[in-house]
């Protein structure tokens, strides 16, 4: 996709020197989903190291996480796009999820191509999870279920929903989607309650949610299946290697029109955070791609 290529090209440091006056007050870091999900977890992990970076530059400010779920992430993106472009409101974005309006020609309340792109902070792959207490122990079990599967989800604008639709359409399995959950943690929990049969989450989230062994991980769409998922298969094993290309990018942006000086400062703070040894260790331990 041309728009995605353009976004990635923007995720590089600017050559203009950082402006010393920024930041002078707290920065709001908008999270487009509810607490407990992958975007929320990564943002909160980065924040202390961003604050550490700013303190080293002489700015003892706080970076404040602001959860703003709604409309599959579009509520937050519309808010951020209308914020003052002074660097004090930034957001973590779901790509390609937040770009679906642009791709399909629908009005999402913001123009994804006009945001000020600051840095890429993560990439992740998807797994299919079912309840360990249920009968769906494998993809074969799912495909042989004598009805459409029920899939709890955030909504039709989310990347995980798009991933689910790609996977089940490609595999030829009918699906009924149950929308309205505010985070991946919520719709994963819905599977345990029996609201639905299965759902898809990214690898890092699956490992966090499955510490007690409540879930079966029946598929991992990646060239190499994570050794932690002993019963999982990938797209290649299912005869659909193209499914192993389905993934998610986490990118940070601000409103349209931010100055290069402020953007460069935020880029440096995010780079410091994602390259911090403690965050890298956490990412390796939890398989969160940063």
Where in the sequence are the language-model features?
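Short, well-ordered beta-strand elements
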Residues: 25-36, 63-65, 89-92, 148-153
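Extracytoplasmic "Venus flytrap"
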Residues: 29-45, 69-72, 152-159
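Ligand-binding pocket segment of bilobal, Venus flytrap-like solute-binding proteins
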Residues: 69, 152-233
């Amino acid at each position: 996709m041309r728009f995605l290529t353009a976004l990635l090209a923007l995720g590089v440091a600017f050559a203009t020197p950082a402006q010393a006056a920024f930041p002078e007050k707290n920065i709001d870091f908008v999270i487009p989903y509810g607490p407990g999900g992958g975007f929320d977890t990564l943002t909160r992990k980065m924040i202390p190291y961003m604050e550490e970076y700013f303190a080293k530059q002489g700015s003892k400010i706080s970076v404040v996480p602001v959860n703003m779920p709604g409309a599959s992430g579009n509520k937050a993106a519309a808010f951020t796009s209308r914020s003052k472009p002074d660097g004090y409101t930034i957001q973590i974005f779901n790509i390609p999820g937040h770009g679906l309006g642009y791709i399909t020609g629908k009005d999402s309340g913001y123009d994804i191509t006009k945001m000020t792109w600051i840095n890429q902070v993560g990439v992740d792959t998807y797994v299919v999870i079912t309840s360990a207490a249920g009968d769906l122990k494998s993809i074969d079990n799912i495909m042989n279920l004598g009805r459409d599967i029920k899939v709890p989800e955030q909504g039709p604008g989310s990347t995980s929903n798009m991933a689910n639709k790609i996977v089940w359409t490609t595999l030829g399995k009918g699906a009924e989607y149950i929308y309205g959950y505010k985070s991946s943690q919520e719709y994963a929990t819905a599977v345990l309650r029996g609201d639905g049969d299965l759902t898809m989450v990214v690898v890092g989230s699956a490992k966090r949610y499955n510490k007690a062994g409540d879930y079966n991980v029946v598929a991992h769409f990646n060239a190499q299946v994570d050794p932690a998922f002993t019963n999982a298969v990938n797209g290649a094993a299912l005869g659909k290697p193209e499914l192993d290309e389905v993934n998610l990018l986490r990118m940070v942006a601000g409103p349209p029109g931010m100055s290069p000086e402020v953007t460069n400062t935020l880029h440096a703070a995010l780079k410091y955070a994602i390259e911090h040894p403690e965050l890298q260790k956490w990412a390796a331990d939890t398989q969160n791609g940063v």
